[in-house]
Regions:
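N-terminal alpha-helical targeting/anchoring segments
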Residues: 1-131, 149
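TRNA-recognition modules of translation machinery and tRNA-sensing kinases, especially anticodon-binding
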Residues: 126-429
Length: 429
């Protein structure tokens, strides 16, 4: 949620910032300003009436004592009571529309981002060299099938299209990746979280994914009551709400977390032909990094998360690039995002394996998450940041394809070998 003060101070700048995200919210901004004025006018008028009500109420004993007619006074008291009740009802309606519109506005992009969509994304740096083969490489679907890593047919039989089932050494490779991520984050001093996989609506609202994307996640309706839960599309939705409606001590910041969860996505639309396999599915494993920081520390925290994501990919031996996203390619909740992209040989080009983002105070305002500033004793909204650390659904196919040998076997990355009993190469039985 944006700061209303920021909108009121320079509404045209806010409109321009949102247009840089390729979103035109001019009408919404104008309506928010009108509702804010109407809200303040109603509150002022109600306070005036309550003051008159209090004054009239105090005058009644003196009027009775003097033997004067109190009927007009009681009539006025009744009028004030009715007017206050009507104002309260109007205020509830105004505030409901105001909140709905405020929740609908995307976050403003940082001013150094290029406007527009992905065509204006800016590669910042490259690591390593693109992988080259001296033989015709296989697609990861064929490699995973031949080596018994994944059973696509039975995965579909169990859950339908967009699902797969890890088997044998494939399951162990997947778990090795996750353990590598987890051990690295623990060594960096981050706290491990295993959150619920089903969340309340407010979690999606705080993260900025709801209400806009509420229909794009899986819902579970409790048959015994009216409660609806949502399968988490990413651990960010859970982590962002850990301190919802709380005030933290400044001395306790930053809070550094990571969480492992399966992620569930409906993924509207069908996958493209080149995305066959496990590149795009309805369920995948991911480790998510998250920080709560003071506003003045969030830029350094962002750099830290980017470096952590890069180091995880480096450790696996991949060539990759780090890309600064243009304003319009950042998600609605984020002020800035860097993507870490690797090559999956069968797909050509680069595919994102980690997005690291700074939401500034956008999520904190939506979730009312604050810290108490020691110097002033006053609560302030903190900043939230998140990043994939990492998701496996693209790392796994890239690892299998880039590490394949001419005979159809696959080399195990050195950092994963300890999780597989020292196994260095996996060959077809």
């Amino acid at each position: 949620m944006l700061d209303i003060k920021r909108i009121k101070e320079d509404p045209e700048k806010v409109k321009a910032g949102l247009r840089a995200k390729e979103v035109n919210c001019d009408q919404e901004v104008d309506r928010i300003l009108a509702l804010d004025k109407e809200r303040r006018d109603i509150i002022f008028a109600t306070e005036q009436m309550k003051a008159e009500q209090n004054k009239v109420s105090k005058a009644i004993p003196q009027l009775k004592k003097a033997g004067e007619d109190t009927a007009p006074v009681f009539q006025r008291m009744g009028e004030l009571k009715s007017q206050i009740a009507a104002n309260d009802e109007t205020l509830r309606t105004v505030e409901a529309e105001y909140r709905t519109l405020m929740l609908s506005l995307p976050n403003l992009p940082d001013e150094d981002l290029k406007p527009g969509g992905k065509e204006n994304n800016e590669p910042l740096r490259y690591f390593g060299e693109p992988h080259k083969f001296d033989f015709p490489p296989k697609h990861h679907v064929d490699l995973c099938t031949d080596l018994g890593f994944i059973d696509y047919t039975r995965g579909v039989k169990l859950a339908g299209s967009g699902f797969w089932m890890y088997t044998g050494l494939g399951a162990r490779l997947e778990w090795a990746l996750l353990n590598y991520f987890i051990d690295t984050h623990l060594a960096d001093g981050y706290e491990f979280i295993l959150p619920p996989h089903m969340l309340e609506y407010q979690c999606g609202e705080t993260a900025g994914q709801f209400p806009k994307f509420a229909d794009e996640v899986y819902k579970i309706q409790n048959p015994t009551d009216d409660r609806t839960h949502y399968m988490l599309p990413t651990a960010e939705a859970a982590l962002a709400s850990i301190y919802r409606d709380e005030i933290l001590a400044e001395a306790d910041l930053p809070k550094k977390f990571f969480a492992y969860t399966p992620c569930f996505r409906r993924e509207a639309g069908s996958a493209r032909a080149e995305e066959r396999g496990m590149v795009r599915g309805h369920q995948f494993n991911k480790v998510e990094m998250f920080q709560f920081t003071r506003p003045e520390d969030s830029d350094d925290a962002f750099d830290e998360l980017v470096t952590k994501a890069e180091n995880l990919v480096k450790g696996l031996g991949f060539h990759f690039r780090t890309v600064k996203l243009a304003a319009g390619d950042c998600s609605a909740s984020m002020a800035r995002t860097y993507d870490i992209e690797i090559q999956i040989p069968s797909m050509q080009g680069y595919k994102e394996v980690s997005s690291v983002s700074n939401a500034r105070d956008y999520q904190a305002r939506r979730g009312n998450i604050r810290f108490r500033r020691e110097a002033t004793g006053k609560p302030e909204f903190l900043h939230t940041l998140n990043g994939s650390g990492l998701a496996t659904s693209r790392i796994f196919p890239a690892m299998v394809e880039q590490n394949q040998l001419k005979d159809g076997s696959v080399k195990v990355p050195e950092v994963l070998q300890k999780y597989l009993g020292g196994l260095e190469v996996i060959s077809k039985k």
